[in-house]
Amino acid sequence: EIAESKTPYKHKELWKIFAVWAVLKGIQLPGWPELNDTPNRRIKGRFDELIKIRKFKESIPDWMDKLGVDELGEKKWGNELNALNQKASVIIRVNSLKTSIDKVQEILSDEDIQTEKIKGFPDALKLVVRKNLFLTNAFKNGFFEIQDASSQLVAPFLQIEEGMKICDVCAGAGGKTLHLSALSKNKGQIIAMDIYKNKLHELKRRAKRNNAFNIETRVIENNKPIKRLYGKIDRLLIDSPCSGLGVLKRNPGSKWNLSLDFLNKIRTAQQDILQKYAPMIKKDGKLVYATCSILPSENELQIDKFLKSEIGKDFKKEDEK
């Protein structure tokens, strides 16, 4: 914006972009002829103007800023954006199938990795200083998985009891599936389903490391494996595909790959998934629908639409406890 350049960049425009970057970073420009006419004062003045505008300050596309305001309101959207632009903490979930949170904290401390417990999250530890956890013996032995604190809230909502038949229908590589296994204490049956075979292969590898032996994976190639489970599941987790707007701090570049067209398609897919998988649940069973988006149109509004549908009319939304 300040360099007044647009893609695809020409050679001259690249010099202008470099000049703007250097001036704003306080770097003295080299005496190269391409930089002789750099307007330092104008660059700084223009920056001071733009930094007051949210879409520039928070670095988001125009359409996304409008969408956020429309769905959340000015104040809440501004607060969410500010939080999403903060550096993400490294959070782990201790694998209770193998060890305890105190033991993992002690083991990591011996490897010069300091952690803190998080109030309200019984299996979570936060790293005081970011370090490579994948090289630790504790990770290699399956004592923990890296999993955001908010993600660790999802599985407990299912209120699992030992011996239940549980289905995770958008399992992916299985972060929440492994948590379900730990909560079930390796008893009962967990069916992890996904359309991507390679992700389920990774889940199998992780499950072996975690000593999670009650997980069965099934690749969804058609509707047959879904319909076979109609009326047979005690607990159903739909960790639905979404825009990912709630985890931009983990993957900030993804916002530039999103579009309204994609968002509309993903909303349609979310409702289709609810309609297709909800009949799996037994009478008096429970369904948890989760996304990593902050948009009501991907969360509350999807649930409200489902509850008004023919398939969803017999479901009742529970209040958060």
List the model feature ranges, each with a label.
Residues 1-134, 232:
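Class I Rossmann-like S-adenosyl-L-methionine
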